[in-house]
Amino acid sequence: MTRISNKYGAINLSQGFPDFDPPKKITDRLAEIAPHGPHQYAITWGAQNFREALAKKQSHFTGLDIDPDKNIVVTCGSTEAMMASMMTVVNPGDKVAIFSPFYENYTADTILSGAEPIYIPLVPPTMAYSRACSRSEDSKQASVSSRSIAAFSFDANLIEEAFKQGAKALVLCNPSNPCGKVFTREELQTIADIVIRYDGYVITDEVYEHIVYAPHKHVYISTLPGMWERTISCSSLSKTYSITGWRLGYVIAPERIIDRVKKVHDFLTVGAAAPLMEAATVGLCFPDSYYEGLQAHYTHMKHLFCDGLRQFGLEFTDPEGAYYVMLDVSKYGVNDDLHFCEWLAEHVGVGAVPGSCFFKEDVHHLVRFHFAKRDETLQAALDRLSALDSKAKTYQCTEVNKI
């Protein structure tokens, strides 16, 4: 949808990257090392000083004793981290449980690993989606009652059923892209109990670990009893330090798993960029005040954007973490969310992602916006979205004429 946004000159709230700069200390360090390096390969699983700084940071936030030599592989973004982790623990013919909605790469990673995905619905507070779950052939067991549901939730029985069917691992995106769910400690314990019972693994995607809105708290499932041995934690520096283009990610896991991840990683990309690791090491050493400021900054952006949507009478998911909202466009008679997003970019001037990209179920009434933008960018987008209701009348007429 970035291409569509560029085509029509729309404000791009589709692809999840910020339009503000990384912390100056990081970019200053990059400028310092540009003349003299490092410019050649680092150790394939990550430069020593980078891994040491990362181990110290993550040990601080998780309370775990993470060894920089035994428990870390540095990857080219969390995308590679997830692929390497999947190929490490999953064999051809295995199955992998994935919550729906989901970041689209998870399905591809599963298939490329020779495994089969099993989808577990996260049920949001919309009756339209509840009905979609009920009639989806792939979600016959996921039917939900017609009562209102307070937040995204899951049926633990469906997780257990997935492992009964042979799931080797479960993918956990927490906080969740696209729905913004932050899993509670109790929910994570429920997942952990099932995974332990069936001798499985959890592969996490925790790239938004520091973007969580009060009163919610991020809990690392690897810290629960019995889960360090069964968790392959994937994350990156992209969102935390606003360096999505630097492609610096990592895997944290027990030594017996990391030894195998190293081998897979070596044949996927060899190693992450040495000068970028050197520069980013500065960020890994930031004090707690940086992460508190980051959370405050994102809370401000969330309030600015969501308050604007509320003023227009629009219905959307209220994120607990990450930086996405899913807008309910069912009142405009939307049957094809891709077509609607193309229309939105052309006629309203704001880019969004069709919600159906993230769902296994038959869901076409949601579109995803992200709000990791400067105030002036968000305000300009809101100014354009203020005309959505009036302009949508032409869209509705178009849809009627198509019928």
Predicted features and spans:
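Conserved N-terminal alpha-helix of the aminotransferase class I/II PLP-enzyme fold
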Residues: 41-76
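PLP-dependent class I/II
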Residues: 1, 5-9, 15-33, 64-403
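A ubiquitous short alpha-helical element
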Residues: 39-42, 263-264
